[in-house]
Amino acid sequence: MATLLALLTLAVLLVIPFYIIYKPPASLIDYFARRWPDVLWQVSTDKKIIGLTIDDAPSQHTSEILRIINENDAHATFFLIGSQMNGREEDLDDIIKSGSELGNHAMHDEASRSLPDGQLESEIFEVNRKIKVAYEYQNKPMVANYFRPGSGFFNDKMRRLVDKMGYRMVLGSVYPHDAQISSWRMNANHILSMARPGAIIICHDRRSWTIPMLRMVLPELKRRGYSIMSLTELLKEVDTDK
């Protein structure tokens, strides 16, 4: 009996940290937002508004993802990997035309924290140049500079660098780990169970399972009364309350 109890205790101790990583409680996200206020995790509001962000764009799935977003009267911030942008200018044009927006996700799909400062700065600058070209082609100004680090990890040096470059670092508060988990239904249920006013959803382009996930998530959020917004729209909506 004592052995069984010990094994159960060990199992609980092993499972709890993984569960907290998979579904961090609101209190933990609130702590992160206080601890690193220069990083955007969520916004504080009682309004039924929620931010949608799409990482690892553009890809062969971008046009369908954007179509689903548009069908649900939603907007999103697409975080772009610079090495994927050449040859997908039409996707970028369509994103901007639709009222969604472009953000910076560095040049390659790798952990930004592992890069030397000079290389990261160069990559952010190069992706920024490409984003500016996309906006200029549409005769529209860049309204904001958002950077999301590859793999989602950052340190104090990166925060200082990003701030010096005039960028707002963005993480989020609802992440279904869809970059690794291919079950669209599981990912959709994760998002819907974590959605709350002011949340920022992180999901990924370049994965075919994102499409059915969004087909389930976006109509359900609308049914619950949420407006689904880009980061700029989300921040502006909160500013009107002040």
List the predicted regions and their residue ranges.
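Conserved nucleotide-state-sensing and coupling region of NTP-binding domains
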Residues: L221
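Active-site environment of divalent metal-dependent phosphoester hydrolases
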Residues: S59-H61, D109-S112, F154-K157, H177, ...
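Active-site beta->alpha N-cap acidic-glycine motif
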Residues: A26-L115, Q119, E123-E136, M142-A144, ...
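A cross-domain feature marking catalytic cores of carbohydrate-active enzymes
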Residues: I54-D56, L80-G82, N104-A106, P149-S151, ...
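Basic- and aromatic-lined ligand-binding clefts that recognize polyanionic substrates
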Residues: A134-F154, R159-R160
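N-terminal membrane-anchoring alpha-helices
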Residues: M1-V39
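His/Asp/Glu-enriched short active-site or ligand-binding loop at hydrolase and phosphoryl-transfer sites
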Residues: F153, M158-M194, Y226-E237
